A protein has these predicted regions:
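Structural and coupling elements of P-loop NTPases
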Residues: 1-530
Length: 530
């Protein structure tokens, strides 16, 4: 086997998704702990002196205890090279999450054992299902009072339309949660230890061993466990082809907080999840193991390091081998380039790398030439990877700098944050950038925008929410745009590409405007590839 094939086969690149507060970021930390990447896990919520989670690198994330931007973390464990893409769980940042899922070969779906399938779980699952990537389910918080495990499996199948296969089974729940039964190895794993910051000790016992009743403090509990396991055995078998197609989800139970069940989950997951998958381009499917390098940009982030004040473009390598200082071709820019400072990341920590392989994510310095969705290839191999989803904003805010002397910083900040895809900026026709209209999917994005403008660019903002919630592109106008008959429930805007749009206070206002302007044709901005 060639070195190229061997290296690519070692890669495991996956995203972790969940509804807010299901424990996604804590699980990410425990992957790093058991993978040997960190000596002690941070805790997202807890004592004030607990350090913040490794994956939450932005200052506002550390303060609020939530993830508002995707993090990329690479580490080596058990012969695998692991690339974790941690995503925001909050629905206001779903656009960043959707883009990140485009770079993943598999997904870990974290579910709260007490709450089951929640709204954001459904939305993110749909994106994974559209891509037909393997989806592994981790039922978290078994250390708390949870719903019946069989009911949870039924709900996943009913709500998400995917078959399930329990890879392990919980031994008790809440204060009685002591471990899991590993079905593949036919063993009971009892865990102990009170702090979730360190590895949990475990003891292996046979399911039918007489000491199990003693460990469970009840012969009745032992018999119930045996009955559950035997009931599972009468069900469907694990079909890896169905897993790879995204039709069957292996399910694991555990507690990210106490670490119970985390180590066997990570070990099994790395064996089951696929090596980097082939990608579709406009010329057909690109072979992952082709020696020719190719990649696409799925994320842009400014000011990850305050000392540098730079901007990184995150590239998912789709084929071949990347080498530092080699010559590559930027398809959208139509030019050759050398990427001399490629970096691999552990959240905000960076390290210059000489080479990387298909499946890896690298960050490259971006002087403003890259956009989300761009394709990079070797010279002579020109094609475009499928686009990245973009979303129509649902909330709009008029924004300007409180201090007019800060105009330059205001323009730079809004443009850079918009290029990251965190916000969309519009302006009134024939106006400058002194005042802009910011559009976002969720209002929490406005809080983050305001926080970053102050902290990263030194600009205090004047912000006025606007009564608009719908936006449409003008496809055809019956008259000059400034002569359109618009009421108080509509306003004409331009985007950064100079395209003309209308924003409306309601869906009914759209219909009213079209009827008042015969010949006006509007296009809906939907989740689209761009």
């Amino acid at each position: 086997m060639s070195d190229l094939v061997q290296e690519i086969n070692r890669r495991r690149t996956f995203a972790i998704i969940s509804h807010p507060d299901a424990g996604k970021t804590t699980l990410t930390e425990k992957f790093l702990l058991y993978g040997g990447a960190i000596a002690q896990a941070g805790v997202v919520k807890g004592k004030k002196n607990s350090r913040s989670a490794t994956s939450d690198w932005m200052e506002i994330e550390k303060q609020r205890g939530i993830s508002v931007t995707s993090s990329v973390m690479q580490f080596q464990s058990g012969g695998f090279c692991i690339n974790i893409l941690d995503t925001p769980g909050h629905q206001d940042f779903s656009e960043d999450t959707y883009r990140t899922l485009m770079a993943a070969d598999a997904a870990v779906m974290v579910i709260d054992g007490a709450k089951g399938v929640e709204p954001q779980t459904r939305k993110l699952f749909k994106v994974c299902a559209m891509r037909h990537i393997p989806i592994f389910t981790f039922v978290n918080k078994m250390d708390r009072e949870t719903r019946d495990p069989f009911d949870l499996l039924d709900e996943v199948e009913r709500e998400l339309g995917i078959e399930t296969y329990a890879m392990n089974w919980p031994i008790g729940s809440g204060k009685d949660f002591q471990g899991v039964y590993d079905r593949a190895e036919s063993r009971l794993l009892f865990f102990s230890g009170v702090s979730g910051k360190n590895r949990a000790d475990k003891m292996e016992v046979d399911l039918y061993d007489s000491q199990v009743a003693t460990l469970l403090d009840s012969e009745e509990k032992h018999q119930k466990l045996i009955e559950d396991v035997e009931l599972l055995s009468a069900g469907r078998e694990l079909d890896m082809e169905e897993v790879r197609c995204g039709n069957l989800s292996p399910v694991f139970f555990g507690s990210a907080l106490t670490n119970f069940g985390i180590e066997p989950f990570l070990e099994a997951f790395l064996k089951l999840t696929p090596a980097p998958l082939a990608r579709v381009a406009d010329c057909g499917t690109i072979d992952t193991f082709s020696p020719d390098f190719s990649a696409f940009v799925f994320k842009i982030q400014a000011n990850m390091n305050k000392a540098h004040r730079d901007r990184l473009a995150f590239m998912r390598i789709c084929s071949g081998k990347f080498q530092r200082d080699a010559e590559y071709y930027h398809m959208q820019g139509g030019r050759k380039m050398r990427l001399s400072q490629p970096q691999q990341l552990m959240a905000a920590e960076r390290e210059i790398v000489e080479e990387a392989y298909a499946g890896d994510v690298i960050g490259v310095f971006d002087p403003g030439i890259f956009s989300i969705g761009d394709t990079i290839t070797v010279p002579g191999k020109k094609f475009l990877y499928s686009g990245i989803p973009t979303f129509a904003p649902e909330h709009f805010c008029r924004v300007s700098a409180k201090d007019s002397m800060k105009r330059k910083q205001f323009v730079k900040g809004t443009e850079q944050i918009a290029q990251e895809g965190a916000i969309q900026i519009f302006k009134l026709p024939n106006s400058g950038m002194e005042e802009v209209i910011v559009g976002v999917v969720g209002t929490l994005q406005l809080d983050v925008f305001q926080y970053r403008m102050k902290g990263e660019y030194g600009v205090d903002l004047r912000m006025e929410m606007l009564p608009y919630e719908e936006i449409r592109m003008i496809a055809k106008s019956p008259c000059p745009l400034d002569e359109l008959n618009l009421g108080s429930d509509a306003e004409l805007l331009e985007d950064y590409k100079g395209r003309n749009l209308l924003v409306f206070s309601s869906y009914w206002a759209i219909d009213f405007t079209v009827r008042r302007n015969p010949g006006l044709e509007l296009q809906e901005i939907v989740v689209a590839e761009g």
